[in-house]
């Protein structure tokens, strides 16, 4: 990588660290209409857009999220702060996960913590995740700069400087992409494991399983009686 490419990476990292995010305290405590929701999201996440005309959130997106059971429906056409939290989760997750995987993650979250008496409250969950992600963001420059240094050690025997610069840039993109690919696989495996365990626990027990549980309970009761007698 030439000096210009290195400077670009440095500038990009500084920009990423300073990007706007939806802080827990930024979310309004009043309910919003759909137009107000899209405006709010666009104002707070505009720095993340790749292109100027990219849309952070549209009415169609919100309606589709509701139809696909990612987002609970509004109440009298108004969206609460809990809706904003869920929409923010969707915004980040949709860049790496399928709609079905996001649904598997968000459904348990919204069922238990969306406008319920569940503990912790959804705003507490959002705040804790936000605080952890801030720490991850602080560690990002060191990780990317490390991969940048590795890419600069590649293709050193290429004499043409323009070709060398491209190949080293390609190396950096591959290193970063491999990192994302591996983490995406880990995420999908975690979701699959959770889904399988939940399906197993939700499945009605067979007569044999019920009998086995009763037998084990009787054995445990006998063991408890023996232990009590021995103490006497």
Where does each model-flagged region fall?
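Extended hydrophobic/Leu-rich segments
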Residues: 1-3, 8-16, 155-159, 166, ...
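Basic helix-turn-helix/winged-helix DNA-binding cores
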Residues: 2-112
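Intrinsically disordered, low-complexity, charge-dense segments enriched in Lys/Arg
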Residues: 108, 112-223, 227-232
């Amino acid at each position: 990588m030439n000096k210009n490419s290195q400077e670009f990476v440095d500038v990009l990292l500084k920009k990423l660290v300073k990007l706007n995010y939806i802080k827990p305290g930024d979310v309004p405590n009043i309910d919003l209409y759909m137009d107000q929701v899209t405006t709010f999201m666009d104002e707070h996440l505009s720095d993340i857009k790749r292109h100027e005309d990219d849309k952070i959130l549209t009415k169609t997106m919100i309606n589709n999220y509701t139809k696909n059971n990612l987002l609970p429906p509004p109440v009298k056409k108004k969206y609460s702060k809990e809706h904003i939290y869920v929409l923010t989760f969707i915004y980040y997750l949709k860049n790496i996960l399928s709609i079905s995987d996001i649904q598997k993650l968000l459904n348990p979250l919204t069922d238990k913590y969306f406008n319920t008496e569940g503990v912790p409250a959804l705003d507490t969950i959002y705040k804790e995740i936000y605080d952890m992600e801030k720490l991850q963001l602080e560690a990002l420059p060191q990780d990317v700069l490390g991969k940048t240094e590795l890419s600069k050690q590649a293709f050193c025997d290429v004499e043409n400087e323009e070709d060398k610069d491209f190949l080293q840039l390609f190396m950096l993109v591959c290193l970063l992409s491999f990192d994302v690919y591996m983490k995406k696989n880990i995420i999908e495996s975690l979701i699959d494991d959770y889904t399988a365990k939940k399906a197993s626990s939700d499945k009605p027990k067979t007569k044999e399983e019920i009998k086995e549980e009763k037998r084990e309970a009787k054995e445990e009761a006998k063991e408890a009686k023996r232990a009590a007698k021995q103490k006497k």
